[in-house]
Regions:
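Polybasic, glycine- and aromatic-enriched phosphate-binding surface used to engage nucleic acids
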Residues: 1-128
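Non-catalytic DNA-recognition/assembly elements of restriction-modification systems
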Residues: 118-175
């Protein structure tokens, strides 16, 4: 009944087109990550690298729902809240943003940027990781720009310490 509509869908890459031609009903770019409780996301088409945590939402009719980003949003899924804020904090920090900006295409930022970064795996027993996660979550909740800036400064210092960067190194990447 919907074959014609499904066969005329646009926006698929070459390898996806071959699958779609064989299986018109295929759902592509869907995997376990799609249904993760938390997603660390950034815009694919962007001139700057800004990350955020997408968390479950309360809907008055449906109860808890998991937002599903569209194809213009790149994300990493996890079911652990602290891990999501840790990764977002690392990616949001001045040292890592500097690396991403130096590497990224001027108009798009795909998931391949993660391949170029050495991000230590989240360890819930590591107080530094938990501190980065807590600071990032605090920054997400802050509405006052002065508070946001103060949290950003603390986050930058925490990530710099994790990577063994000095204050001078941090000042250099901030400028």
């Amino acid at each position: 009944r919907f074959r014609d509509l499904l066969e005329t869908r646009k926006g698929f890459a070459g390898w996806e087109r071959a699958i779609q031609e064989r299986y018109f009903y295929a759902l592509l770019r869907v995997g376990p990550y799609t249904f993760s409780r938390y997603k660390v996301a950034w815009r694919y088409i962007a001139r700057s690298f800004i990350t955020a945590v997408i968390a479950p939402m309360q809907d008055p009719y449906l109860g808890e729902t998991l937002p599903l980003p569209n194809e213009k949003v790149v994300y990493v899924g996890t079911d652990c809240r602290e891990e999501a804020y840790y990764l977002c904090g690392i990616l949001s920090s001045a040292p890592v943003r500097c690396c991403v900006i130096c590497y990224m295409n001027p108009t798009s930022i795909s998931a391949h940027v993660l391949d170029k970064l050495h991000i230590p795996a989240f360890d819930p027993a590591d107080s530094r990781h938990l501190s980065i996660a807590a600071l990032c979550e605090e920054g997400h909740q802050a509405s006052d720009p002065r508070c946001q800036d103060a949290v950003r400064q603390q986050l930058d210092r925490a990530v710099a310490a994790l990577y063994g960067l000095t204050s001078a190194d941090l000042d250099a990447v901030r400028s």
